[in-house]
Amino acid sequence: MIGRDKNRAAIVLWSVANETPNHDARLSFLSRLVDKTRELDSTRLVTAALDTQSRQGNVRVIDDPFSTHVDVIGINAYCGWYGGAPDDCARWTWESANGKPVIISEFGAGALQGRHGAANERWTEEYQAAVYEHNLTMLDNMRFVRGTTPWILKDFRSPRRPLPGIQDFWNRKGLLSDSGVRKQAWYLLRAFYERKALSQQRENDKED
């Protein structure tokens, strides 16, 4: 893959793993994979999407031992979806054990487009929007975060998502439905990005 795609300008990072369990054999294999990646392409940084953190109350410490081998740490953080309630997320604080740049490689929640209800009712657009709202507050508080990639733009087919009447073999975490209809969370994320862009523009104007 690296040999095929290393001249593509769209490739920013090489990711060598996604949510791998923490044990010695994994650390040995992945560290060798990082070395091979750098041998094949010395011009790009190497990352991995991790989901191992130690927890101390509302504090999450990024201390996966494999994080010492990569250049940029990716974190898959599904607060409010795979753990906790949406309003827990804004109270979470994060620490990075080794000071490396961090990207939130996945975050989000599922919703069936057109399904409405209370903000605490799973699979509704309101619940997905609440997860995004509180996660975006959490991200604002993570000063060492250098980027995010919400999971995911559009619903897609998934044979592992059989829940009848809701999933029907689709992954429903998209900000858009499978037919491209925007869900409520899409507008929240757009406003977040617009706010970030305006803030950056103001910083640039100060430097000028």
Segments from the language model and where they lie:
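Substrate-binding/catalytic cleft of secreted carbohydrate-active enzymes
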Residues: M1-R195, R202-D208
